[in-house]
Design a protein with these regions (language model features):
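Pre-recognition alpha-helix immediately N-terminal to the DNA-recognition helix
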Residues: 14-19, 75
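Short alpha-helical segments that sit at the start of domains
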Residues: 1-16
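Helix-turn-helix/winged-helix DNA-binding modules
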Residues: 8, 23-24, 61
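Short, locally clustered residues in the helix-turn-helix/winged-helix DNA-binding domain
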Residues: 18-24, 81
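Short amphipathic alpha-helical interaction segments
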Residues: 37-52
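Short acidic, hydrophobic short linear motifs in intrinsically disordered regions
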Residues: 25-34
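Beta-hairpin "wing" of winged helix-turn-helix
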Residues: 53-62, 68
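Amphipathic alpha-helical dimerization/coiled-coil segments
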Residues: 1-3, 74-88
Length: 88
């Protein structure tokens, strides 16, 4: 299944969106990086791109930046999740 999924998507960004969708709480970048098995610095670069695409937004709570999906991001995550289910 992993190989089929990788044919269609860049694995880490897609997994980040799906992970944010499945867990409705706002998330920290470091936790998200661990969930998708990448370094924190790589996760930050991906998240910056997702923010530019208006798929995620950040909320600062003191020193911590929390991440959540936008409406558009949720729609994209739903589509990725559906496709992932179809190619299993």
């Amino acid at each position: 299944m992993k190989e089929n999924f990788d044919i269609f998507f860049r694995r880490k960004p897609a997994l980040m969106l799906v992970s944010l969708k499945k867990n409705t709480r706002m998330r920290y970048g470091s936790i998200l990086a661990k969930e998708v098995d990448c370094t924190y610095s790589h996760a930050v670069k991906i998240l910056q791109t997702l923010e530019e695409l208006k798929l995620v937004e950040f909320e600062r709570k003191g020193r911590i930046k929390l991440i959540r999906l936008t409406k558009k991001g949720r729609a994209v995550a739903d589509a990725i999740d559906n496709i992932q289910g179809l190619i299993r």
